[in-house]
Amino acid sequence: MSLTLSLIMPREQALLAAALAPYLAEVAPRASIDPARCAGQMLNRKDVTAFWIRNGTQRIGFAIVLNLPDDRRELSEFCILPQHRRRGWGQEAARTLLREFPGRWRMGLSKSSADAVAFWGTCLSAMPGIRDLRQGAPFTEHQIKSYSFEIAGAHDD
């Protein structure tokens, strides 16, 4: 069964907060971030698109995309829930999400999650259609580095 993305609706704020709590503890353990408040902010911003990552009807993770000016995007948050990791679904979900929105992307990587740093290094280097992959400085004090890249669209050469 292949993975799909579905929009996270504002009425699902409590579900997103429940998924965010362990994720935030993993990626920003020293930050005091209220998952419920964070979920509310994410779901009510006009420049954010939030997705469930699904395997069939089961929610196995989420992705939060910040829509930036000039048709650029930032992968703000990306999580495959721990019980669903190490099955290839993270790479499949990343490919699905990025193919859905070709163009310029950026993302920061948490300094508290060595697994995420390793995952994204491998995932992006093997991503079909990726161009101009660059490693850069972190965006926040909670990050170790960032990536910027472009994903080719269906009609790009």
Give the ranges of each region predicted by the language model.
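Active-site beta-strand termini and strand-to-loop segments that position acidic
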Residues: 54-56, 149-152
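Conserved beta-strand-loop-alpha-helix junction that forms the acyl-donor binding cleft
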Residues: 106-121, 125, 135-144
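Conserved acetyl-CoA-binding loop-helix of GNAT-fold acetyltransferases
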Residues: 80, 86-99
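Short amphipathic alpha-helix that is part of the acyltransferase structural core
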Residues: 1-34
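Short hydrophobic/aromatic beta-strand or adjacent loop that forms the aromatic wall/cage
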Residues: 48, 142-150
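Active-site rim helix/loop that mediates acceptor-substrate recognition in acyltransferases
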Residues: 28-56
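Conserved beta-strand in the GNAT
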Residues: 52, 58-67, 74, 79
